[in-house]
Amino acid sequence: MPRGDLCTRTLAMPADTNPSGDIFGGWLMSQMDIAGGVLASQIAEGRVATIAVDGMTFHRPVYVGDTVCVYGDIEKIGNTSMVLHLESWVLRKNQPPRIKVTEATFTFVAIDAEGRPRPVRKDEADV
């Protein structure tokens, strides 16, 4: 079962494939970054920036027509940063209900209008 809450859901399209016809790993990573940004923005109650991606693991390929669902879970909230565990699962015709395809740890920092780090108030981090 997916770990965390559903952050985004999108359909893998032909334009997102690599030369072998599978979905390009960079596209999947960008979907995870978008999903993590959604969750981190909610936690920070404002603008955030990705500062690190660790342990990116591609378990299975993603195919055209798969519905890609990205789930996020809070691992740690610091003074200005948030560490999130993100997992991508697909819904695929004629397959088990969900298949985990990718996971990684993303770190985001809360930033102000000038792009400088700003505090994340831990007492308001209930998402």
Residue ranges, per PLM feature:
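HotDog/MaoC-like acyl-thioester-processing domains
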Residues: 2-8, 63-64, 75-127
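Hot-dog-fold acyl-thioester-processing enzymes
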Residues: 1-52, 109-127
